């Protein structure tokens, strides 16, 4: 049987990622080096192997199909078929131990032979098939990722996935899809939200939705036993409170280091910051709003964003100017920027018939040019800056500040006008999947409902392209078109610290820096 090479990103991508890491500030590299285990790092006693996480992202449900099942993979409660490396170039085994593309549209996956759900039920090919089909049927985010795929148990631990069209990067689409006992979910109904039957190396011993989850090692897990004996994740929405908890030794991990706290962490010079990948911070525009459907208004809003002020002020020193969807410097990124020109923005709004009113907000035919901006947590400071910048061109802004977990359902419902929602472009091995999620007509995670038939056609073409150079070229063509349409407003590329570890935390996985992984442990005092 003819076998097809599984697509991994080539040497050019890996070299670009290395070059980007080499440009990080020296202090960040030194701090990151501090997280590496040394020869003298002796584990603490068993009763001290506890990691307390403070985070603004807490699960309200343990059911992986629920949009608010936050961090259940990151915290080790659920597992996907595969993980993705930090640079987006490689797949890492999880429930799947190996995989082969045997035909352009057929994947054959060998599962971990000893995998079990927490209930003891086997994680065999039939169970994984049922889990993926349940995601396909009932998970709004996964539905588009798995669209057209069919699943078959070809043996006790052999799963076959047939895609509707050739897709050499298909498995990258599964990295956020938690495998679960679908039969138990159907039998338990709403109880499954609190008592899910998953596969993770940690198993909950206490769960208060949206507030607290405590976990201990699952002794029946197929992989190595975690070195930590307990994890405690608490919802702490205020970033300063998280920082103070870390400073006081009441937490070992801050899962959401925000802009205002990063300098305070650095000044203390005793915390460790595992490097995270750069993302493109963008602003979402809801095309269902009649004013935002106007390309001229979208262009004016983009021109009115003073990116120099944000990059050099609010986000300093962790940001650079954005180009397109993907962070600048990646081989499939584009070089052209969206420009800032408030004078041109005012001129454009004048040409569109919007005249300044008594309070400075523009008016046309009795209608005020004003929008509500959805924001939360770590983007609040940047949203305040945007509010001031847009007021300078005559656009009225009201900030709608919500908790991070609340924002997911708001975006899913389309109940926003403009949003600083963190669904951001980043390095990936699945160019098709990421660009499709953001820009293809009708896809759930295309939150703004942008639509362009030319973009749709290019995304469809990208899906089945095996040649790396042609994939990169198609990705650049797509980005050029969506940038021209102002589908999103690209503001900055940021290497956010993102995660802070207490001095005694060791063993973080460099490919999964945001996660609590089996190799992490607490060193002796």
Where are these regions (language model features)?
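N-terminal lobe/hinge region of extracytoplasmic solute-binding protein
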Residues: 54-103, 110, 130-133, 197-199
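Alpha-helical secondary-structure segments
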Residues: 124-131, 156-160, 200-201, 228-230, ...
């Amino acid at each position: 049987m003819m076998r097809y090479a599984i697509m991994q990103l080539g040497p050019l991508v890996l070299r670009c990622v290395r070059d980007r890491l080499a440009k990080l500030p020296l202090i960040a590299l030194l701090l990151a080096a501090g997280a590496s285990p040394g020869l003298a790092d002796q584990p603490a006693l068993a009763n001290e192997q506890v990691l307390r996480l403070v985070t603004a992202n807490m699960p309200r449900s343990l059911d992986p199909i629920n949009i608010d099942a936050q961090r259940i993979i990151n915290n080790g409660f659920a597992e996907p078929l595969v993980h993705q490396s930090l640079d987006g170039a490689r797949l890492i085994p999880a429930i799947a131990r190996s995989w082969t593309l045997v035909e352009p549209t057929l994947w054959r996956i060998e599962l971990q032979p000893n995998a079990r759900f927490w209930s003891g039920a086997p994680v065999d090919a039939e169970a994984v098939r049922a889990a993926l089909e349940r995601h396909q049927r009932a998970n709004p985010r996964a539905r588009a990722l798995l669209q057209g795929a069919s699943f078959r148990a070809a043996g006790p631990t052999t799963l076959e996935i047939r895609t509707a069209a050739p897709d050499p990067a298909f498995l990258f689409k599964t990295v956020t899809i938690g495998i679960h006992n679908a039969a138990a979910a159907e039998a338990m109904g709403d109880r499954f939200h609190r008592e899910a039957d998953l596969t993770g190396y940690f198993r909950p011993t206490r769960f208060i939705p949206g507030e607290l989850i405590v976990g201990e090692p699952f002794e029946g897990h197929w992989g190595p036993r975690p070195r930590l004996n307990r994890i405690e994740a608490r919802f702490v929405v205020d970033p300063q409170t998280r920082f103070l908890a870390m400073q006081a030794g009441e937490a070992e991990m801050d899962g959401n280091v925000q802009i205002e706290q990063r300098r305070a962490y650095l000044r203390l010079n005793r915390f460790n910051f595992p490097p995270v990948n750069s993302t493109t911070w963008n602003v979402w525009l809801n095309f269902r709003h009649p004013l935002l459907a106007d390309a001229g208004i979208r262009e004016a809003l983009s021109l009115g964003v003073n990116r120099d002020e944000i990059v050099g002020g609010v986000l300093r020193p962790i940001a650079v100017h954005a180009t397109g969807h993907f962070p600048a410097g990646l081989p499939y990124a584009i070089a052209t920027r969206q420009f800032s020109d408030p004078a041109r923005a005012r001129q454009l709004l004048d040409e569109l018939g919007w005249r300044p009113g008594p309070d400075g907000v523009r008016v046309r035919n009795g209608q005020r040019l004003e929008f509500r901006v959805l924001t939360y947590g770590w983007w609040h400071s940047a949203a305040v800056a945007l509010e001031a910048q847009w007021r300078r061109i005559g656009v009225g802004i009201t900030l709608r500040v919500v908790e991070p977990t609340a924002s997911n359902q708001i975006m899913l419902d389309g109940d926003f006008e403009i949003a600083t929602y963190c669904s951001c472009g980043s390095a990936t091995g699945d160019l098709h999947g990421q660009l499709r999620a953001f820009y293809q007509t009708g896809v759930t995670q295309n939150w703004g409902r942008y639509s362009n038939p030319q973009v749709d056609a290019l995304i469809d073409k990208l899906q089945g392209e095996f040649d790396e150079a042609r994939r990169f070229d198609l990705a650049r063509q797509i980005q050029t078109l969506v940038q021209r349409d102002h589908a999103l407003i690209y503001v900055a590329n940021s290497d956010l610290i993102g995660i802070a570890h207490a001095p005694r935390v060791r063993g973080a996985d460099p490919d999964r820096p945001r996660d609590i992984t089996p190799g992490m442990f607490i060193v002796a005092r």
